[in-house]
Amino acid sequence: MFDIDFGILFPISWEQSPIFLAVGLIFAFATLSPWLRSGERLINGREGFEILWTNAKKRYQTKGRSVMEAGFSKYNDSFYMMTDSGTEMVLHPRYVDEIRNDPRLDFHRYMKTKGGEINRDLIQTKLTRSVGRLIGSISAEIEDALHNRWEEGEGEYEEYLLVLPPAEMHTEWHEIVLLSVMIPVVAQGVSKMFVGDPLCRNKDWIGMILRHTRSVQTALRSLRLWPYFLRPLAARFLPTCRQVTAEIEEARRIINPVLEKKRAEKLAMIQKGEKPPEPNTYMDWLEESDKDEFYDPVVAQLKISMAAIHATSDLLSQTIFSLCDSPELVKELRAEAVSVIGAYGWGKEAIYNLKLMDSVLKETQRLKPMQINLTRLALDRIKLSDGTVIPRGSKVLISCHNMWDSNVYPNANQYDGHRFYKLRQRAGMENSAQLSTPSPDHLGFGLGMYACPGRHIASTVMKVTLCHILLKYDFELAEGCTPRVIEYGSFLLADPTARVSIRRRKEEIQL
């Protein structure tokens, strides 16, 4: 899922900023430390008469993939790169097996998150195991959201729909800005698992988490251009960061009454000698978890919602863009959905047996992963098998460019929706070629001890959503529209402006 540096936004304290250091010493450290650490192996330094690293960071933000490609063309194994997070050591993907489970390379410390281990455990041991019994409920939310957003033009994103009377929107072709209309659909679907009823259909909650996702991304873009030691101070005054803080308080006003009601009902049942209902949502399991000083149920909900909604909507939208160029593949996917859902209904068996759909999603993610590297912080000095040294305290990026290597995947630059479906037919690859199974050759969901804990949930939500879209809508790219891949630093994002024409069709089976 989407990696977000929450540590500089939630929470912010004056103690984080070394305000008592002399200004001259700070300035010297900020300007010289990247060069001192990386030496000649810094691939993208300052240019001309630049003193600070701000412009180098901006160049990385707009050309991150090109900078990384230039680094590997000059240095085969490792080099340093100035990113918007500072100087980072970049490693070739051949090292991924060495670092995947090394506890000295820490993802949470890189992201500066607190309580991440608790959230990961809850997602893996509680939420993922409950998905099977929630699939029918998730489907109902997706169905409701698609009807309201794609057909009725309801809600915050109605400006992204071609204006038509609601009746005609059921039968006539009309345009949508796909990503912008996909986001609230996914938000309602995942909220069923995260907060449950009634919040999953609460327009204030859905609208708030959508706005908050945009606000956090905007705040981080501006904040990362500041020297690290000044970020806590800048976050106090930048309007974008103040907006994030205001939205957290708005989230508290929405969630806290629901939490208080749940707590009161549970206490009343216990006092009567009755057994409270079993936890059924992420919110419930957070309440049941061992809480520490970092426990904040509202911030926890915002974090998981942002990560899940953004990444899932992005991959779904990119998949639809790819399918617009493959009408025969669309027919095959529809036939598979009719066959599988008709045979199994909504359950784990259905999700597992949507094998072509699984392959299509995995191939889309292979060609356009949301992030082109894995991230870690070195807690100690580490010497790799070939003698390469990772200095203690280094931020480390492991490149994912092997996913586009024709030595790994034949015709790697071509989209082949059947690629992983065929691989699953090979002996011993039934599981390894699945979307939710990371491997050294496919790092879309990370790898090892820090692989995305919500990947099984994301896979389920995407398959349910695609089934509804495929069976209920005809779709094609809007006239004159060619979706782009938006590059931002290490991220590859689906085109947020690309338009798709859709029309309601009669589904072959009831979902």
UniProtKB/Swiss-Prot annotation:
One GO biological process term: secondary metabolic process
Chain positions recorded as heme binding sites: C452
Lineage top rank: taxon: Eukaryota
Compartments (UniProt record): Membrane
Function: Cytochrome P450 monooxygenase; part of the gene cluster that mediates the biosynthesis of the indole diterpenes nodulisporic acids (NA). Nodulisporic acid A (NAA) and its chemically modified derivatives are of particular significance because of their highly potent insecticidal activity against blood-feeding arthropods and lack of observable adverse effects on mammals, in particular the tremogenicity associated with the paspaline-derived IDTs is not observed.
UniProt xrefs under InterPro entries: Cyt_P450, Cyt_P450_E_grp-IV, Cyt_P450_sf
Protein's name according to its UniProt entry: Cytochrome P450 monooxygenase nodR
Organism of derivation: Hypoxylon pulicicidum
Major location category of this protein: membrane
Essential cofactor(s): heme
Transmembrane residue ranges: 8-28
Residues that carry a glycan: N76, N373
Topological type in the membrane: Single-pass membrane protein
Pathway: Secondary metabolite biosynthesis
PANTHER family: CYTOCHROME P450, CYTOCHROME P450 MONOOXYGENASE AUSG-RELATED
